[in-house]
């Protein structure tokens, strides 16, 4: 889960696709190659595992964040599941990995109250806008790596991305003669992601090896469904309206 106003935009906070060994080195991943650690960021690294090794890895993140606006301070403690994956030798020159990891997370709740004007009897009218969002996208992946040469490997990951994201805005006024409203936007995503990886190893001696890595992700429009809901009310009377869509690009 998360609690950040920045997740209001786009698909939310994009998850770090790196595993523990990558996070420990500041997020580098494309060149990492280790027979005892999974590197799902570059599928070419899957060939590093030997025939007697089966890897299973899981991780989570704990976060402590402080937000400040003017004199208002807020502390948020979040925990999130990061990944679950396994890797094994598929063939003499081929390795494989499968796993599950988040793609993005959305979670926020904030409000703002402002003074608009005074009505006929001099009463101040306040407007309160409340913003909330939750949800996120998950991804399941499977990938293979193939050792073309002793020092050159290639690989590919295919991922299925799915999930729902909801954003809502509620506007309320302090007087009874003004319309209040709520607007809800929800998107549901079901799509794929395809990544290609390459790794080249240059061996200086028995102890020192320099690894080069590169990854290319196939770009395409995101497919999904959108749902919109709008409602206004005044003195107990509701005036709802809905609208549905088919494609999000």
Where do the PLM segments sit?
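Short hydrophobic "helix-edge" motifs at membrane interfaces and signal-peptide entry regions
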Residues: 31-33, 139-140
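Transmembrane beta-strand segments of Gram-negative outer membrane beta-barrel proteins
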Residues: 4-29, 47-64
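Outer-membrane beta-barrel translocator/receptor signature
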Residues: 32-111
């Amino acid at each position: 889960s998360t609690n950040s106003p920045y997740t209001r935009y786009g698909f939310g906070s994009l998850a770090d696709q790196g595993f523990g060994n990558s996070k420990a080195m500041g997020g580098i991943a494309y060149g990492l190659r280790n027979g005892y650690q999974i590197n799902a960021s570059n599928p070419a690294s899957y060939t590093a595992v030997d025939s007697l090794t089966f890897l299973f890895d899981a991780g989570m993140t704990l976060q402590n964040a402080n937000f400040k606006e003017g004199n208002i301070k807020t502390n948020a403690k979040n925990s999130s599941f990061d990944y679950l994956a396994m890797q094994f030798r598929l063939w003499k020159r081929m390795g494989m990995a499968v796993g599950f990891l988040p793609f993005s997370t959305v979670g926020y709740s904030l409000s703002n109250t402002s003074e608009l004007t005074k009505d006929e009897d001099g009463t101040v009218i306040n407007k309160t806008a409340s913003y909330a969002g939750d949800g996120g996208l998950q991804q399941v992946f499977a990938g293979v790596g193939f050792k073309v040469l002793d020092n050159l490997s290639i690989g590919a990951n295919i991922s299925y991305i799915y999930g729902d994201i909801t954003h809502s805005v509620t506007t309320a006024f302090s007087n009874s003669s003004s319309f209040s409203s709520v607007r809800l936007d929800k998107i549901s995503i079901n799509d794929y992601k395809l990544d290609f990886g390459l790794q080249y190893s240059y061996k200086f001696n028995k102890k020192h090896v320099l690894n080069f890595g590169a990854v290319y992700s196939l770009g395409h429009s995101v497919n999904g469904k959108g749902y919109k809901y709008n409602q206004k009310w005044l003195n107990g009377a509701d005036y709802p309206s809905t609208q549905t869509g088919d494609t999000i690009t």
